[in-house]
Every structure is written in structure tokens, then in C-alpha cells.
């Protein structure tokens, strides 16, 4: 019952984002509209008052939690990689409930600017913490000045490994009669609609080139 009427987000961001994503799943699967006002309130509070420009979430180090509204520091931001993963998952599920592009816009921001920044190109070193400002002198990343090959609490590497393989399955969504492109990437797929199957091919070098061709 405590989840039905929240006005703002509190507590540990990863735990809360997982709860909110689950609420959105319940709404999408059951059509329980009693959850919608709470989810809308939560989403607006996060995006309007607590999200960094990178899609990162969480200003409080000690509890790995959401800070006060509009407290969005650069150097001292926490922005845990797990929270960015949760931001993608929550917003994708919100999109499935409403088919509103603003949700996948936020998911895209978090994916490109926070999730993917949490791992190096070789895939073997990680950020736990993602501040917006780093000077190579402050050991901001769990005692390190840069990415780490592992952590004592290794939730972030495993959450990246959990999300990335799901992205191909999140590229498109559909109803009986409508197809939605949720992320831009070079892809091809076959979408089953009520009147038959539709083959889609998307050609793009996004985000390095904003040209997208279907």
C-alpha cells in the first residue's frame, strides 16, 4: 500500500528503481490503473528534480540514495552505474505502459551517457560511481581514480552484463496494429501484427550520425 501514493522518491535508488520497474511491469501486464498516478508522480519527480544531464541518479554517497530535490552536484555526484541501469529498465517499462516517446528518450540518455560510461571499451574495467567532474587526483571510484577491474560489492559489472544483452530485444515494441522504434541502431527484425508480419531494417550510425533510415 505504501507504493500506491508516493509524491516523491526516497531511499536507496537502486532498490527503489527496481520496485518502480516492477510496478510498471504489473501495470503493463494487468492493466491495474491504480498504479498509474503513483508511477507518473515518481517519474516526474525523478526526471524533473533528481536526474543529472547524463541520466545519472543519486547524490548521496553514504546511503547510495536520492538526495534532496534539485541537489545535483558535479564533482560529488554518486550516480551509481546500477542506478543508470535501473533508470533504463524503469523508463522502458513506463514506455510499454503508455507508448510515450519521452520515456525512451530518458532511457536513451541514461544508456549512452551513464551505463556505457560505466565500462571501458575492452569490457574489463568498470565505474561504480559516475560523477560529472573528475580530475584524475580524487579517488572517487571506490578508492580508485579511474575504472576498476572489480569491486568487493560487484553489483555494477553484473548489472551491465545483465542489461546489455537485453538491448537487442528492446529495440522495437508493437501492439496488434502498431510498431514502435524505441532505440536507434542498425537492426533488422520481423514484427508480427494482426494482419501479418512486417520486416523492418534500420540503417544508422547513431549516435555518431543522426541520420536514420528505415
Task: Please annotate each region the language model reported.
Residues 1-214:
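Glycan-recognition and catalytic cores of secretory/periplasmic carbohydrate-active enzymes
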Amino acid at each position: 500500500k505504501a507504493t500506491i501514493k508516493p509524491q516523491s522518491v526516497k531511499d536507496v535508488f537502486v532498490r527503489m528503481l527496481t520496485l518502480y520497474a516492477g510496478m510498471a511491469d504489473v501495470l503493463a501486464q494487468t492493466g491495474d490503473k491504480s498504479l498509474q498516478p503513483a508511477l507518473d508522480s515518481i517519474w516526474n519527480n525523478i526526471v524533473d528534480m533528481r536526474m543529472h544531464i547524463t541520466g545519472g541518479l543519486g547524490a548521496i554517497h553514504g546511503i547510495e540514495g536520492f538526495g534532496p530535490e534539485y541537489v545535483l552536484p558535479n564533482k560529488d555526484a554518486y550516480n551509481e552505474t546500477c542506478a543508470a541501469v535501473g533508470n533504463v529498465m524503469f523508463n522502458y517499462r513506463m514506455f510499454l505502459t503508455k507508448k510515450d516517446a519521452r520515456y525512451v528518450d530518458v532511457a536513451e540518455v541514461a544508456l549512452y551517457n551513464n551505463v556505457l560510461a560505466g565500462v571501458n571499451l575492452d569490457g574489463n574495467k568498470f565505474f561504480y560511481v559516475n560523477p560529472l567532474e573528475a580530475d584524475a587526483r580524487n579517488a572517487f571510484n571506490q578508492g580508485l581514480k579511474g575504472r576498476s577491474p572489480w569491486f568487493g560489492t560487484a553489483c555494477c559489472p553484473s548489472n551491465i552484463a545483465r542489461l546489455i544483452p537485453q538491448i537487442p530485444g528492446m529495440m522495437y515494441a508493437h501492439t496488434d496494429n502498431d510498431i514502435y522504434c524505441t532505440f536507434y541502431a542498425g537492426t533488422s527484425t520481423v514484427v508480427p501484427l494482426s494482419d501479418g508480419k512486417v520486416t523492418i531494417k534500420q540503417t544508422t550510425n547513431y549516435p555518431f550520425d543522426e541520420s536514420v533510415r528505415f
